Amino acid sequence: MKKKILSLMLMVSLAASLAACGQDSGKNSNSTDLSKTETEASSGQTGEAETTLVYGSADYTRINPAMDEHGEINLLLFNGLTAHDADDNIVPGLAEKWEYDAETCTYTFHIRDGIQWHDGEKFTADDVKFTIEAIMDPENGSENAPNYEDVEEITVIDDSTVSFRLSEPNVAFLEYMTMAILPKHLLEGENMQESDFFRAPVGTGPYKLESWDEGQSIVLVKNEDYYLGAPKIDKVIFKIVPDDNAQAMQLESGELDLALLDPKNAQNFKEKDGFTCYDMTTADYRGILFNFANDYWTKNRDIIPAVCYSIDRQAIIDSVLLGEGMAAYSPLQRNIYNNENVEHYDYNPEKAQEILEAAGCTRNSDGFYERDGEEIGFVISVMSGEQDRIDIAQAAAQQLRETGINW
């Protein structure tokens, strides 16, 4: 029988605890401190040294925080009106304070004095209005647009004050205002997806772009005029190493000072002299994303629970992540927006088979379920270079086969 094929990102949903590793100073003469490598300062003056951190990074085609949802480098180059503290609480960012009028559902933000863009231009409320309206414009196709659907009006009161009137209360709005603000004076009239600005970004953050060697490295230098004070590390190099295994090798060889590793690679460094590992419980997750743009899942929506019941999250955490993770049931796991009462679809292959059979599926001679003469199955697409995603997808695929769903 002909198998139905579609592209589906299949990764078990879990909040992984990953490890960042770097070499310790003082362990031996060749070791490098986690946070800095000392080199001669560019000024050449005796006794001066600059500190450089080399970080193993995925590749970038652009740096565009307003249009793209993710990007580690964004936090070093840009700021939002609000920010997170070490405990993930919302704290002031570019805005020193704000008020909320419950009667009109209006937030009013007051911007700090003296904020400058990396090119020396003054940061104003006009930049805030420009950025959020650009995100909201459907023609720009921003991944972040859904966060601002409640915004009815943005008003610039003066250079240092901007207000947002919402259609209804939104408990997450201050979280959304951690969004990086972009410079109106450099982007007004530009294509928000294709502007050259996103290859030479100018922000307000603690670091500014020095150089970008495509496919090799992105070099940032500290912003001496940063509103919270200049960073202690003079230079941060995002060395492009897209493969997790290659990052681990370069960390061990000393080519990298810092890398965010999957648990299997991190395990090799935990007892190794000269390295420090930090276990971080994060909100990062891997999830099954059904491609509803393909009518296969529109027509077979009723068997989606069978896929969910076929996945043993804890077994994957134990085998792929060496126990360094927690079973997750939605993208919101570790904050106040998490709803513990949602259906968890815990591992239950018998229930998965009941759902398939109730939907009219029958087993073929190979032991896999068919429906209307077509085998239930799909192509599993997974991001290359990230070994934990690959391993998770392979483990999930095997569990699906054990239920009777082919791939």
Regions inferred by a protein language model and the residue ranges of each:
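Surface-exposed binding/hinge segments that line
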Residues: 99, 103, 145-187
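Short, well-ordered beta-strand elements
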Residues: 49-61, 96, 106-109, 128-131, ...
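N-terminal lobe/hinge region of extracytoplasmic solute-binding protein
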Residues: 56-102, 133, 202
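Aromatic- and charge-enriched surface segment that lines or borders ligand/interaction sites
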Residues: 96-141, 163, 297
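C-terminal motif of bacterial Sec signal peptides marking the signal peptidase cleavage site
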Residues: 17-20
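Append "and occasionally in soluble cytosolic enzymes with long acidic Gly/Pro-rich linkers
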Residues: 299-398
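Gly/Pro-rich hinge or "lid" segments in bacterial periplasmic/extracellular proteins
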Residues: 85, 89, 178-231, 235, ...
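Ligand-site clamp/hinge motif
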Residues: 223-269, 397, 404-407
